[in-house]
């Protein structure tokens, strides 16, 4: 039996949700209602995020990337936490509802590409179009977009101890099957509502301290 860590990116590894930051900077006002519908779960993640990105002109692709790379801040303790997972022999995968054009550049030098699972954006048309290489399998009907439970079924052994780290509705379904959940933001209230045991955190130093305390 081994330990497998599945970690969110936006708002978890990074201080801000980068899709929200991108929309706030470049999208017309219609994005706000779409975002609210996703967060209150009246619109699926795939449908809502897809519609949000369709508001962005493709010819601004480089501006989007440059903006995010210049503003993204990694959450305190992340690099040290990665080193600790490696020293313990844990497998660490980033499973993100974010987009490849910013997730991969930000994690370069920290997480190998084969351990990053995220969405793809096609900028070949007039507006951005999200494609979904990790869509829901037959066991999930939530229209997740990047389906974290589906990915877990593919890469996590049934005998593994599964640790999930996340902050929002996109992490909720995978949190339901985790052995240990580290939560911040909206994920805390979702876990509380469903009675899912979780450990609140603000930085990765908090997670490291808790893991040492329980001798994980």
Swiss-Prot record:
Pathway: Amino-acid biosynthesis; L-methionine biosynthesis via salvage pathway; L-methionine from S-methyl-5-thio-alpha-D-ribose 1-phosphate: step 4/6. InterPro entries: HAD-like_hydrolase_phosphatase, HAD-like_sf, HAD-SF_hydro_IB_MtnX, HAD_hydro_PyrdxlP_Pase-like, HAD_sf. Keywords: Amino-acid biosynthesis, Hydrolase, Methionine biosynthesis. Pfam families: HAD (PF12710). It catalyses: 2-hydroxy-5-methylsulfanyl-3-oxopent-1-enyl phosphate + H2O = 1,2-dihydroxy-5-(methylsulfanyl)pent-1-en-3-one + phosphate. The keyword Cell membrane does not apply. It is an enzyme of class 3 (hydrolase). GO terms for biological process: L-methionine salvage from methylthioadenosine. The keyword Lipoprotein does not apply. It comes from the Bacteria. Dephosphorylates 2-hydroxy-3-keto-5-methylthiopentenyl-1-phosphate (HK-MTPenyl-1-P) yielding 1,2-dihydroxy-3-keto-5-methylthiopentene (DHK-MTPene). Belongs to the HAD-like hydrolase superfamily. MtnX family. HAMAP family: Salvage_MtnX (MF_01680). This is 2-hydroxy-3-keto-5-methylthiopentenyl-1-phosphate phosphatase.
């Amino acid at each position: 039996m081994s330990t497998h860590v599945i970690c969110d990116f936006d708002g978890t590894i990074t201080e801000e949700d980068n899709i929200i930051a991108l929309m706030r900077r470049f999208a017309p006002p219609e994005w706000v209602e779409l975002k609210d519908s996703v967060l209150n779960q009246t619109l699926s993640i795939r449908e809502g995020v897809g519609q949000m990105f369709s508001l962005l002109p493709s010819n601004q692709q480089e501006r989007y990337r440059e903006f995010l790379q210049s503003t993204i801040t990694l959450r305190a303790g992340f690099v040290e936490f990665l080193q600790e997972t490696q020293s313990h022999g844990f497998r660490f995968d980033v499973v993100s509802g974010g987009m490849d054009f910013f997730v991969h550049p930000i994690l370069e030098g920290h997480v190998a590409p084969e351990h990053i699972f995220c969405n793809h954006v096609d900028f070949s048309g007039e507006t951005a179009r999200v494609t979904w290489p990790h869509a829901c399998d037959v066991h999930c009907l939530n229209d997740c977009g990047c389906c974290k439970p589906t990915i877990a079924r593919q890469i996590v052994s049934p005998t593994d101890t599964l640790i999930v780290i996340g902050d929002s509705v996109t992490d909720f379904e995978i949190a339901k099957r985790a052995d240990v959940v580290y939560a911040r933001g909206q994920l805390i209230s979702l876990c509380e509502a469903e009675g899912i045991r979780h450990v609140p955190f603000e930085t990765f130093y908090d997670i490291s301290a808790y893991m040492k305390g329980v001798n994980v």
